[in-house]
Amino acid sequence: MNNTYPHPIIAREGWPYLGGIFIVTLIVHAAAGLGWAWPFWLLTVFVLQFFRDPARTVPTQANAILSPADGRIVAVEQVRDPYADRDALKISVFMNVFNVHSNRAPVDGTVQQVQYFPGKFVNADLDKASLENERNAVVLRRADGQVVTSVQVAGLIARRILCYTKVGETLARGQRYGFIRFGSRVDVYLPLTARPRVTIGEKVSATLTVLAELD
């Protein structure tokens, strides 16, 4: 996996959408003028902001668990991690359609498992979405042996999960490893000893926000 994603301002996942709507907009504008074309220009601007993908600076704290996504915290609770088969602290980030949708590694680690599960498409803001919706789990093991699980969860509108990593690869904190189109949720399962640094309702930014700290 390429560790040096070039951050071309607009996510590569959006290039086909942007190219298509831009061509249609130019055709309508040329044929009918701005009066007919302005809704298409607005749509073009929306697509631009939706697929924006700015570079992020990784915090220096070695024990920090970084947010894998932009969004809002909707859960901080002790649960069972069904992917790593353990009790864990779960922190969930809900992404709406206006958030950046790139997903980034929360820790440095080696990929132990990549598990895809088909499922429903209920509102990702609901707790039941974590285990009922379509999802993709990546289990990471840090050099110190601690395990962190990051789960991309599809939502009511988002029905396309993209994951670019595989078992055996090493991810660096903040490294881009996936994308979910049109808003959704990412669940992060941490060791029970992790100390949360966010609260429900708090807005977070991928890589920039520290979700928790490990011992």
Swiss-Prot record:
Q: Which InterPro entries did the record assign?
A: PS_Dcarbxylase (IPR003817), PSD-A (IPR033175)
Membrane topology annotation: Peripheral membrane protein
- Task performed by this protein: Catalyzes the formation of phosphatidylethanolamine (PtdEtn) from phosphatidylserine (PtdSer).
Q: Name one Pfam family in it.
A: PS_Dcarbxylase
Question: How is this protein named in the record?
Answer: Phosphatidylserine decarboxylase proenzyme
A single GO BP term for this record reads: phosphatidylethanolamine biosynthetic process
Cofactor mode of binding and number, as noted: Binds 1 pyruvoyl group covalently per subunit.
Q: Where is this site: Cleavage (non-hydrolytic)?
A: 183-184
Query: Which cofactor does the UniProt annotation name?
Result: pyruvate
Q: Where in the cell is it found?
A: Cell membrane
Kindly report, in one word, the top-level EC class recorded for this enzyme. Answer: lyase
Which species is this record about? Ralstonia nicotianae (strain ATCC BAA-1114 / GMI1000) (Ralstonia solanacearum)
Q: Which family does this protein fall into?
A: Belongs to the phosphatidylserine decarboxylase family. PSD-A subfamily.
Q: Where is it mostly found?
A: membrane
Keywords carried by this UniProt record:
Cell membrane, Decarboxylase, Lipid biosynthesis, Lipid metabolism, Lyase, Membrane, Phospholipid biosynthesis, Phospholipid metabolism, Pyruvate, Zymogen
Do you know which PANTHER family this protein is assigned to?
Answer: ARCHAETIDYLSERINE DECARBOXYLASE PROENZYME-RELATED
Pathway per its UniProt entry is: Phospholipid metabolism; phosphatidylethanolamine biosynthesis; phosphatidylethanolamine from CDP-diacylglycerol: step 2/2
Per UniProt, subunit arrangement is: Heterodimer of a large membrane-associated beta subunit and a small pyruvoyl-containing alpha subunit.
